[in-house]
Amino acid sequence: MKRPRAPSGSDGESDGPIDVGQENDLSQMARPLTTPSPSQMQARKKRRGIIEKRRRDRINSSLSELRRLVPTAFEKQGSSKLEKAEVLQMTVDHLKMLHASGGTGFFDARALAVDFRSIGFRECLTEVIRYLGVLEGPSSHADPVRIRLLSHLKSYAAEMEPSPTTTSALAFPVWPWSFLHSCPGLPSLNSQLAILGRVPGPVLPSISSPPYPISALRSAPVHRPAGTIPPTRRNLLPSRGVTSTQRAHLPERPAAPPPTALDARAARSIVPIPPCSPTTAPGAGKSDDNVSGSISSPCPSGPTGRPAGAVFYHSWVSEITEIGAF
């Protein structure tokens, strides 16, 4: 749009049209910045509401955690609804108490475990009450089963208080021996339990130990008659070397018949020698009943590696010594 310029008295100015359309365009562009449209205003209000709701949710979540963690606030939950200012005040008082006590109660693992158990039970009780109310509706408040159930749970929750027993009385019982015997890969479990202090060290079971204390084995008699050993166990026990200090009485072995052509003096001075001719103990010539275990010498052996004519025999002494040494 062009309009003619008004005539002026000066001759130096040129007469020509002036463009005014650009001014109208600038005025139309500046109008939305001052007055937003209704859709933009609605979107802005919606964003503000979402941000404010998130902020309130964070505050309420933190306050609910404080109600659960602070003991005084947790105990007053059932009686009446706590305000936010009361919860904050109880939190401040609790922190002051912990700071004054040096934090000893805060780091007590057993007290924390008992406290969290009580808190968890009460939360479960609250969830049960809420679920029954949602499932049955308002008409279920007079249900006798519901009343008895809630009464029992509330009375049990009221009785849940920390017991004065010490942590040493809460040790776990010893595991069954059959379980340890069936698991040969657990030899290091005994040392771990002994370090924890839950099971006394001398009574710990091992893979090859019987289910009674080791001290009872060490006090057992060293010499035991061979006749008291059951024949089945005598045949099943493996053969072990017997030292000179732990020898047991062996049964009488068949000896070769003495020569008949010698006189009485020679017969009294000669000791009967078995076919395998082992090196016998010094007192073997006095009595045949006191023959002890001997050191093996080169002689013919049986199919199992034992000397010919040897008897399957095992004494309790070697087993006791090996168990005690283990």
Swiss-Prot record:
Q: Which GO biological process categories is it annotated with?
A: atrioventricular valve morphogenesis; cardiac epithelial to mesenchymal transition; cardiac ventricle morphogenesis; cellular response to BMP stimulus; endocardial cushion morphogenesis; epithelial to mesenchymal transition involved in endocardial cushion formation; glomerulus development; mesenchymal cell development
Kindly give the CDD domains that the UniProt entry links to this protein: bHLH-O_HEYL (cd11447)
Q: Can you give the residue ranges of the bHLH domain?
A: 43-98
Q: Where do the Orange domain residues begin and end?
A: 116-153
- Residues covered by region (Disordered): 1-56, 223-260, 272-306
Q: Does the keyword Transcription apply?
A: yes
Q: Return the Low complexity bias intervals.
A: 292-305
| Region feature (Transcriptional repression and interaction with NCOR1 and SIN3A) | 42-111
The miscellaneous comment for this protein is: Expression in nascent somites is reduced in mice lacking Notch signaling.
Assembly information from the UniProt record: Interacts with HES1, HDAC1, NCOR1 and SIN3A. Self-associates. Interacts with GATA4, GATA6, HEY1 and HEY2.
Role played: Transcriptional repressor which binds preferentially to the canonical E box sequence 5'-CACGTG-3'. Downstream effector of Notch signaling required for cardiovascular development. Specifically required for the Notch-induced endocardial epithelial to mesenchymal transition, which is itself criticial for cardiac valve and septum development. Represses transcription by the cardiac transcriptional activators GATA4 and GATA6.
Q: What is this protein called?
A: Hairy/enhancer-of-split related with YRPW motif-like protein
Native source organism of the sequence:
Mus musculus (Mouse)
